[in-house]
Amino acid sequence: MNSYKINAFDHCELYVSNAKQAAHYYRSCLGFQPIAYQGLETGSREKVSYVMKQNQVRFVLSSPLVPGTEMGHHIDKHGDGVKDVSFAVDHTENAWKETTERGAESVSEPKLIEDEKGEAIVATIKTYGDTTHTFVERNNYKGVFLPGYQVMDVDMVADPVGIVHIDHVVGNQPDGAMQPVCDFYEKIFGWHRFWSVDDKDVSTDYTSLRSIVMANENEKIKMPINEPADGLKKSQIQEFVEFYEGAGIQHIAMSSRDIIKTVKKLKSNGVEFLPTPQSYYDTLIARVGEFEEDINILSEPVSYTHLTLPTILLV
């Protein structure tokens, strides 16, 4: 029994080469509203960050302002990608103390941060690759995000596309690393195995993978852990690990109340989609039975959005 509770995903921070440009894309194409900012104007001399929000989803898009920083090295090595997956907790100090006592490596100890809107407590630990988890306790904070960020007063309001919350966050591992990472989440956080598949379940003639989904107690947090399996061609998981130069977040899945409307809106905003083979839809009814949606509408490309790392998946 943990001495703290993880309530939900708090936010994901992406390290990107141009935070301002990325923020523009997330607003104009994905419907995220910029709500907070941190940079030179707020006293941050090493990094600039834009906080983007749509319903319950928050992304922090950050870029370095000076050379030779850990953030700059991360971008040089991995390209644009997810650095931190943060959890909203009821007690940061207990979360940090318990996870580090169980073997997690600390990045930063619990720290009280405050401004005129109140106070929050944050702490960070390492997970696989160069990825981290930050515990965020904001029980006594009334601002839009966290102390140190100023509210963004923007003239142009984003047009939401129907994204509601983060459904799951997927981490890709080198071959043989999936089980140790899952053991880490079970030991450090007390999470349980929610679902699993092997190469017999997720495979094609050319590529395959193994996956275990780890979840917290209330199952608001789901983190599939993938590793490559042998196929006639290189697994997409292995391709990611080689391109990213190690383990990391492959994609962030976000829920939509009406995925058809969401996808249509995204396409009208200029988001590109990878095509789904027509053969998938030709056998769909035989595989899953009758359903209400118009198959002619479904057969339009609706799978993964074609973005820079990490890919975004709609569910």
Question: Can you say where each PLM-predicted feature lies in the sequence?
Answer:
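Beta-propeller domains
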Residues: 171-222, 226
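Acyltransferase donor/substrate-recognition loop-hinge adjacent to the catalytic core
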Residues: 129, 133-172, 192, 217-224, ...
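A cross-kingdom feature marking solvent-exposed beta-strand/loop segments within repeated
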Residues: 37-47, 65-84, 102, 106-121, ...
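Conserved active-site tyrosine of GNAT-family acetyltransferases
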Residues: 22-27, 99, 185-186, 266, ...
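An N-terminus-focused feature that recognizes amino-terminal "leader" regions
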Residues: 1-128, 136-139, 146-150
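Acidic/polar loop patches that form or flank catalytic/metal-binding clefts of enzymes
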Residues: 35, 179-181, 193-197, 222-223, ...
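N-terminal beta-strand motif that seeds the catalytic metal site of vicinal oxygen chelate
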Residues: 1-20, 82-85, 142-182, 245-255
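Conserved small/polar residues in nucleotide/adenosyl-binding loops
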Residues: 305-311
